[in-house]
Curated annotation (Swiss-Prot):
It comes from Lactococcus lactis subsp. cremoris (strain MG1363). InterPro entries: Cyt_c3_hydrogenase_gsu (IPR012165), Dihydroorotate_DH_ele_sf (IPR037117), Dihydroorotate_DH_Fe-S-bd (IPR019480), Dihydroorotate_DHASE_ETsu (IPR023455), FAD-bd_FR_type (IPR017927), FNR_nucleotide-bd (IPR039261), OxRdtase_FAD/NAD-bd (IPR001433), PyrK_electron_transfer (IPR050353). It comes from the Bacteria. FAD binds at R53, P54, I55, S56, L70, Y71, R72, G79, T80. Binds 1 [2Fe-2S] cluster per subunit. Binds 1 FAD per subunit. This is Dihydroorotate dehydrogenase B (NAD(+)), electron transfer subunit. Responsible for channeling the electrons from the oxidation of dihydroorotate from the FMN redox center in the PyrDB subunit to the ultimate electron acceptor NAD(+).
Length: 262
């Protein structure tokens, strides 16, 4: 696992949905980004808070040495709110890329891939889909949001080749009315590999339905402190060994479904 650190430069920042910001960062850390699903650990500006903020990498451009992160902000007291006030040219203390990402090397052009994302768990799935596009596989992507005003990355996913995209919103303001699990129940083909990231309830539903799938990859969301596996603040139960704890920041955030007790 890489533990590199750099003062990265903010290239741009904008609000892309209600309380959801997109920040583009530039720096040499981008050279280390190879696996989709890893995350960055950002220090809050001006030393305002001790703990860094873990934010997944949504995409990267190695030629430009830039990467993009999307994150949801809290109220004015939160670190994410303070990060959202950074303007172009600002410097950010960044560690990463950290954690284990989504494996893509085994995917072939004949595979039928299912990608399921919910809310702010959607961003890391975009770089995953970009990498899978290169294999020529068929991707069905199911995204769920609370409402249309927090919908993100629809155009980006739609512009990829070999993609069938379906969206659900809890309130019915866009796409299918209901949670993303309703879209999952419409899947009528044999899934070769499944990648998912989102809220615990959604992940539990996915894991239950596809518990026999060998290539089920689940990205866990968790509160983190150190981000490098030292503090044990972000543990999950190991389904294969009850005496062992899995650290989301180091062993994950991406796990095989059979490893987790959800």
């Amino acid at each position: 696992m890489s533990q590199l650190q750099e003062m990265m430069t903010v290239v741009s920042q904008r609000e892309v949905a209600y309380n959801i910001f997109e920040m583009v960062l530039k720096g040499t850390l981008v050279d280390e980004m190879d696996l989709p699903g890893q995350f960055l650990h950002l220090a809050v500006p001006n030393g305002a808070m001790l703990l860094r903020r873990p934010i997944s990498i949504s995409s990267w451009d190695k030629r430009a040495k830039t990467c993009t992160i999307l994150y949801r902000i809290g109220d004015e007291t939160t670190g994410t709110y303070k990060l959202s006030k950074l303007e172009s040219g600002a410097k950010v203390d960044v560690m990463g890329p950290l954690g284990n990402g989504f494996p893509v090397a085994e995917v072939t052009s004949t595979d039928k891939i299912l990608i399921i994302g919910g809310g702010i768990g959607v961003p890391p799935l975009y770089e995953l889909a970009k990498q899978l596009e290169k294999t020529g596989c068929q991707m069905t992507i199911l995204l769920g949001f609370a409402s249309e005003n927090v919908k993100i990355l629809e155009n980006e996913f739609s512009n990829l080749k070999n993609v069938t995209l379906k969206i659900a919103t809890d309130d019915g303001s866009y796409g299918t009315k209901g949670h993303v699990g309703m879209l999952m129940n419409e899947i009528d083909f044999e899934v070769d590999a499944l990648y998912t990231c989102g809220a615990p309830a959604m992940l539990k539903a996915v894991a239950k339905k596809y518990d026999q799938l060998e290539r089920l990859y689940i990205s866990m969301e968790s509160r983190m402190a150190c981000g490098i596996g030292a503090c044990y603040a972000c543990v999950e139960h190991d389904k294969e060994d009850e005496s062992h704890a899995l650290k989301v920041c180091e062993d994950g955030p991406v796990f095989l479904g059979k490893q987790l007790s959800l």
